[in-house]
């Protein structure tokens, strides 16, 4: 029998051994479980990463899963320079998944650097479907009536980029509307345009001159019909041809106003004519005869016309204007107006105070800091003094500089506003915004069919444009800088109401004219003219009415297009005009009156001025007046608005 001490020692040893084995077994079990758990985590993570990669690939595929099947410029494949134009893009979704994304249209200079702001259009496509997406870019004109060095690119999906074909140029475009299915009859001299591509707002019809119809458009929505009638009222020409039944089309709804027994009649400033033949018979000779009174495009050197009826014969062109070299560029482009507006925001600094502050600043830096160091013999004091001087004078220069700009943002604008039958206004405007605080600004107007562009040819603009029915322009403007932009829009109201009280003609010229006017005040008016036939007349205010004051000559004499080639620049045609250094804001607004007249009549050449002629039953009144609040940018952060607007109102003359 062992002693108690030996038994106790053996028990401790045995217990410790068993406990150790137990701990080792537990540790081994935990290691096995940990390995299994780690392998599970690894597998789970791998599956998650794989799922994310697959989802990303699917999303990338979906985001890119659209094909561009067709691209069309303008109404007949061409563009009007220095105007907003339509770019129609046919997009298809070939996948079983719906597509929701956006497409971006960007402009590049020579295919390299991006300039101007990007134009963005949202796109939604059902599986295996297609649709037309329309952009409304502003196309600048270069010397010689060409597109110049700018190119356009479409961006979509995740990095997909497609170059848009370079457009041909046609200031006046003529088309015949086709069934949107493309299954209609063919033939004839006019370019075909699918009816569903016709715009829904008047602001997008720049460049359209003639529309031929041999059937009623079946797919038009009410806004397209409204736009079409407004376009005619402002001067468009409609040609009605025989359809497949051998008869003229019979229109219904709002378009029923086109039904008439007359073969040639007026609709506002526009014209509706009937030509008793089908489209295949409407050849070049018939078209030239029908359009003999309409302005035509000028053929450029070494250019072969695709559509002969659109162009002036080169021989006729040279005879009409032997000095055509002087008409190489449009003198009334957006840049000419925006350049004048930009000059209106000029700082009026207190230069005496600024110079005094400058020399004080120099003296405090040296020898001020040097003397400070000798006095205290401590580099920390010198550094503190230098830093304090820089901070103090930075603040002071900022305050004095802001006072030079009036310490406020400013918007200056000019506009052309053409009266519409419903009391609305078809507006083309140019604006310059100056801001003292840098930020993103949203530019928006209270109207429909707003189109925006900076018209920039050399600078990339950090902004995004959404054109269309509810258009807007969001742009980053640095502090103490300008942003110019052009706008086309329809305002719902604001047209002056003018009525003829009396008039008298002598040898087809106005001898007397008295007009009642409502909507424009005498004190807000700068200039008033009237156009009757091919002649301008001066009007003046008398007892709250407008009365004839004198004959201002024919359109060519009034507009002086050849003399206005460099109106917005110096006498050499480039650079800054120092002769206008002292001009006031009012002086610059007055300077733009005649160019705005030319622009409103779509005149950029002497030969075009000689073709200006209104129907004999209309007088067009031009009022250059203070811009009302309805034209202003709808933004409280952009401060005051100052501008002038040229109202163009067609007034029917009573039948004598």
Regions found by a protein language model. Name each.
Residues 401-422:
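Alpha-helical transmembrane signal-anchor/signal-peptide segments
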Residues 193, 207-208, 237, 253-367:
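A glycine-centered loop/beta-turn motif at secondary-structure junctions
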Residues 380-403:
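Internal/C-terminal transmembrane anchor helices
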Residues 206-249, 269-275:
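Short alpha-beta junction capping motif
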Residues 106-143, 538-570:
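Intrinsically disordered, low-complexity Pro/Gly/Ser/Thr-rich segments with frequent PxxP/GP/PP motifs
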Residues 83, 139-210, 265, 270, ...:
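Aromatic-Pro/Gly-enriched surface loop or interdomain linker
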Residues 86-94, 514-518:
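Short edge beta-strand/loop segments characteristic of extracellular beta-sandwich folds
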Residues 347, 427-656:
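Accessory, solvent-exposed terminal regions and/or long lumenal/extracellular loops of proteins
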């Amino acid at each position: 029998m062992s002693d108690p001490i030996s038994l106790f020692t053996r028990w401790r040893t045995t217990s410790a051994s068993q406990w150790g084995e137990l701990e080792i077994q537990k540790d081994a079990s935990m290691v096995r479980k940990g390995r299994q758990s780690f392998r599970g985590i690894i597998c789970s993570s791998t599956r998650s990463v794989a799922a994310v990669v697959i989802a990303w690939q699917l999303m990338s595929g979906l985001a890119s899963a659209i094909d561009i099947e067709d691209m069309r410029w303008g109404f007949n494949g061409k563009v009007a320079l220095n105007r907003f134009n339509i770019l129609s893009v046919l997009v298809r979704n070939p996948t079983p998944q719906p597509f929701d994304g956006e497409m971006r249209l960007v402009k590049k200079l020579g295919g390299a650097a991006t300039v101007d702001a990007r134009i963005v259009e949202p796109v939604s496509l059902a599986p295996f479907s297609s649709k037309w997406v329309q952009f409304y870019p502003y196309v600048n004109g270069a010397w010689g009536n060409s597109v110049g060095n700018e190119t356009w690119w479409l961006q979509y999906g995740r990095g997909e980029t497609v170059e848009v074909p370079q457009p041909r140029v046609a200031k006046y475009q003529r088309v015949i509307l086709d069934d949107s299915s493309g299954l209609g009859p063919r033939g004839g001299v006019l370019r075909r345009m699918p009816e569903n591509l016709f715009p829904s707002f008047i602001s997008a019809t720049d460049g359209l001159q003639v529309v031929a119809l041999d059937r009623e458009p079946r797919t038009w929505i009410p806004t397209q019909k409204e736009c079409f009638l407004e376009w005619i009222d402002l001067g468009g020409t409609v040609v009605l041809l025989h359809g497949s039944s051998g008869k003229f089309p019979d229109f219904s709804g709002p378009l029923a106003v086109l039904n008439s027994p007359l073969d040639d009649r007026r609709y506002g400033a526009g014209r509706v004519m009937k030509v008793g033949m089908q489209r295949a018979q409407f050849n070049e000779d018939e078209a030239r005869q029908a359009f003999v009174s309409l302005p035509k495009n000028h053929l450029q050197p070494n250019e072969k016309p695709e559509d002969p009826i659109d162009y002036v014969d080169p021989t006729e062109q040279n005879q009409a204007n032997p000095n055509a070299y002087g008409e190489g560029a449009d003198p009334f482009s957006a840049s000419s107006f925006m350049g004048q507006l930009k000059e209106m925001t000029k700082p009026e600094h207190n230069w005496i105070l600024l110079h005094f502050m400058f020399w004080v600043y120099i003296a405090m830096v040296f020898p001020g800091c040097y003397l400070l160091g000798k006095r205290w013999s401590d580099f920390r004091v010198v550094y503190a003094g230098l830093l304090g001087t820089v901070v103090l004078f930075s603040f002071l220069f900022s305050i004095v500089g802001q006072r030079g700009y009036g310490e406020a943002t400013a918007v200056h604008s000019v506009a052309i506003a053409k009266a519409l039958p419903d009391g609305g206004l078809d507006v083309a405007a140019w604006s310059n915004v100056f801001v003292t605080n840098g930020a993103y600004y949203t530019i928006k107007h209270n109207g429909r069919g707003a189109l925006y562009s900076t018209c920039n040819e050399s600078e990339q603009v950090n902004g995004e444009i959404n054109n269309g029915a509810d258009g807007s322009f969001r742009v980053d403007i640095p502090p103490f800088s300008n942003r110019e932009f052009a706008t086309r829009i329809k305002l719902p109201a604001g047209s002056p109401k003018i009525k003829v009280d009396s008039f008298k003609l002598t040898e087809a010229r106005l001898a007397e004219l008295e007009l009642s006017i409502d909507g424009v005040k005498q004190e807000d008016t700068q200039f008033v003219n009237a156009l009757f036939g091919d002649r301008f007349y001066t009007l003046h205010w008398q007892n709250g009415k407008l009365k004839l004051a004198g004959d201002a000559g024919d359109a060519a004499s009034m507009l002086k297009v050849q003399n206005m080639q460099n109106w917005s620049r110096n006498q050499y045609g480039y650079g800054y005009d120092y002769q206008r250094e002292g001009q006031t804001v009012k002086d610059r607004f007055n300077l733009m009156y005649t160019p705005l007249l030319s622009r409103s009549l779509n005149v950029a050449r002497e030969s075009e001025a000689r073709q200006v002629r209104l129907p004999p039953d209309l007088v067009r009144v031009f009022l250059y007046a203070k811009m009302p609040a309805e034209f202003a940018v709808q933004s409280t952060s952009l401060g005051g608005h100052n501008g002038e607007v040229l109202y163009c109102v067609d007034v029917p003359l009573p039948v004598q």
